[in-house]
Amino acid sequence: MKPRSGLEEAQRRQASDIRVFASSCTMHGLGHIFGPGGLTLRRGLWATAVLLSLAAFLYQVAERVRYYGEFHHKTTLDERESHQLTFPAVTLCNINPLRRSRLTPNDLHWAGTALLGLDPAEHAAYLRALGQPPAPPGFMPSPTFDMAQLYARAGHSLEDMLLDCRYRGQPCGPENFTVIFTRMGQCYTFNSGAHGAELLTTPKGGAGNGLEIMLDVQQEEYLPIWKDMEETPFEVGIRVQIHSQDEPPAIDQLGFGAAPGHQTFVSCQQQQLSFLPPPWGDCNTASLDPDDFDPEPSDPLGSPRPRPSPPYSLIGCRLACESRYVARKCGCRMMHMPGNSPVCSPQQYKDCASPALDAMLRKDTCVCPNPCATTRYAKELSMVRIPSRASARYLARKYNRSESYITENVLVLDIFFEALNYEAVEQKAAYEVSELLGDIGGQMGLFIGASLLTILEILDYLCEVFQDRVLGYFWNRRSAQKRSGNTLLQEELNGHRTHVPHLSLGPRPPTTPCAVTKTLSASHRTCYLVTRL
C-alpha cells in the first residue's frame, strides 16, 4: 500500500464519516438523525420513526420469505380449442372371463379350485353343468399348466363377439384391436398405438365421428355360478375403459359397464393435466424400467418382449409396484402384471398371489406420485333400448339369431368427443421469485423509502469504513513502527557524533596509520575522515 498524503487522508476520513454519508444517502430519515448538532427531541423522534419503520420492513420481509418457502401452488382451468384431437384408447372386457365350451377336465383339475372354488369331488357335476361329459376313466392331467394359455384359449374371442365396427363411418375389425391381459382376463384395446401403430385422430365432435361397435356378449358361454366367491360375476355385459395410450388400463377398478339390449352413448371431453415437481408438488417424470414394467404383457406364453421404456403413469407405477411385491412374496407374477417373473400357477394364485395382492391393496403400500403431465377423459353416458320392434326381426335375420337372443346378448357402444376442444388443468407456482422481489421492493419503498441502489450505497459506505478504520489501523500501526525505527537510528548516529574528540587545525604530531586511529570510531567511514584530517 502506498503512503497516503494528508489531503488523501482527510478525504478518506470524510468519506467514512457517518454524517457525510447520511446527508447524501437516499434512504429517508438518515439525514435527520445524523445531521450536525447535538441530541434534540426532533432528532430522537426521527430516530424512533426510522427504527420502527425498519422493524416493520424487516418483519414484512421475513413474512414474505417464509410464505415463499412454503411453495404454495394454484390450479388454473382453461378451455382450449383444437383443429383435431387424438382419439383415446378404448379397452373392452367381457365380464365373463372364460367360455364354458372351452373348459376341459384338465382345466378343472388345475384351476377349478383357484378360479371356481370347486372341490375335486365336484368336478364331474360341474362338467355336467357345462354340458360336457365327465373325465374318462384313467384321466391323467398334464404335468404343467399355464394360466395365460388358459385365458388365451378359453377367453372370449373378439372375432366371435364383434358383429360390426365403424370408426368415423369407415369399417374396422379385429385387426384394429390389440390383445391385452388384465385382472378380468383377456381383453382388447382399440387404438392402443402398440407396435408403432399410428394413432387415430378426429377432426369433428359429436356422434358419428368416433367409434361405434356392436358386440355379442355370448351369454350362452357364461360359466354357471357354482359357489359365491369374492370375484364371482353376477352381471352380464361388457366392461369398458377409455384411457390414454400412455397408461395401461385398470379396467377392473376404473371401467364402466355396457349392458346388452341397450345402445350406450359415451360423450367424452379430453382433459390435459399438468402437475408441478418438488418443491411445489410431488409429480414424477421418470420413465419406468421395462424390466419392472411392460404395459402390454399380452404374450400368452408370458415371454418378455423388449421395448423402449414407457412413460411414467400412475396406473403403470402401481402395476409395477404390485408386480414386484407379488414376485418378492411368491416368486411369480399374476398374468396381467408386468415383469419377467414366471406366471403363477393356479395353486400359487390361490395360496399366495391373490391373498398377497389383496393385503397390499388394503394397506396401500405403493407410493406413486402423479405424473407431471397426463391425459384423462371425462365421460357422460346415456342409453337407449335396442332392438326396437321394427329392427328386431331384421337383426335376427342378419345375424342368424332369434329376436330374444338379440335382445339378451347384443349391445351397441358409441364413443365420441362432445366437441373439438379440451380442458387444460395446470398447476402453477402461486408465488414466484419475481413476486417475492416485487413485494420486498414495495415494502422497502413504503417503510424506509429505499431501493436497490440504496443498498448499494450502504455497501459502498461499509467498504469505505472498512478500508479507513480497519485497514487504516494496520497501516498506521506499520507507519508508526517505521517512524520509531528511523528515530532510533538517528539517535544512534547522533550518539556516535558526540563521542568524536574535537579536532584542531593547528600543527600536530605525525599521524599513525588508520589502524591506530580506528579506536576513535567503529565506522570505516569515520576512520577515513580522521585519517584525511
Swiss-Prot record:
| Key words, A-Z | Cell membrane, Cytoplasm, Disulfide bond, Glycoprotein, Ion channel, Ion transport, Membrane, Phosphoprotein, Sodium, Sodium channel, Sodium transport, Transmembrane, Transmembrane helix, Transport
Q: Where is this region: Disordered?
A: 286-310
Entry GO MF terms: enterobactin transmembrane transporter activity; ligand-gated sodium channel activity; monoatomic cation channel activity; pH-gated calcium channel activity; pH-gated monoatomic ion channel activity; pH-gated sodium channel activity
Locus of motif PDZ-binding: 530-533
Induction of the gene: Transcriptionally regulated by the proinflammatory mediators nerve growth factor (NGF), serotonin, interleukin-1 and bradykinin. Up-regulation upon tissue inflammation is abolished by anti-inflammatory drugs.
Q: Where in the cell is it found?
A: Cell membrane; Cytoplasm
GO aspect biological process, one term: sodium ion transport
Extracellular side of the membrane: what ranges? 41-435
Q: Which reaction does it catalyse?
A: Na(+)(in) = Na(+)(out); K(+)(in) = K(+)(out); Ca(2+)(in) = Ca(2+)(out)
Q: Name the job this protein performs.
A: Forms pH-gated heterotrimeric sodium channels that act as postsynaptic excitatory receptors in the nervous system. Upon extracellular acidification, these channels generate a biphasic current with a fast inactivating and a slow sustained phase. ASIC3 is more sensitive to protons and gates between closed, open, and desensitized states faster than other ASICs. Displays high selectivity for sodium ions but can also permit the permeation of other cations. As a neuronal acid sensor, probably contributes to mechanoreception, acid nociception, and heat nociception.
Phosphoserine, modified sites: S523
The record places the motif (GAS motif) at: 449-451
Q: Where are the transmembrane segments?
A: 20-40, 436-456
Subunit composition? Can form homotrimeric channels. Heterotrimer; forms functional heterotrimers producing channel with different properties. Forms heterotrimers with ASIC2; gives rise to a biphasic current with a sustained current which discriminates poorly between Na(+) and K(+). Interacts with STOM; inhibits ASIC3 acid-evoked current. Interacts with LIN7B (via PDZ domain); increases ASIC3 expression at the plasma membrane. Interacts with MAGI1 (via PDZ domain); probably regulates ASIC3. Interacts with GOPC (via PDZ domain); probably regulates ASIC3.
Write down the glycosylated positions: N176, N400
Topology relative to the membrane: Multi-pass membrane protein
Activation/inhibition comment: Inhibited by the diuretic drug amiloride. Inhibited by gadolinium ions. Inhibited by extracellular Ca(2+). Activated by lactate. Salicylic acid, diclofenac and aspirin inhibit the sustained current component. Activated by the vertebrate neuropeptides NPFF and NPSF, and the related FMRFamide. Specifically and reversibly inhibited by the a sea anemone toxin APETx2. ASIC3-containing channels are potentiated by the cono-RFamide CNF-Tx1.1, and probably CNF-Tx1.2 and CNF-Tx1.3 (AC P0DL71).
Family per record: Belongs to the amiloride-sensitive sodium channel (TC 1.A.6) family. ASIC3 subfamily.
Cysteine disulfide partners in this protein? C93-C187, C165-C172, C283-C372, C317-C368, C321-C366, C330-C352, C332-C344
Please report the name of this protein according to its UniProt entry. Acid-sensing ion channel 3
Cellular component (GO) terms are: perinuclear region of cytoplasm; plasma membrane
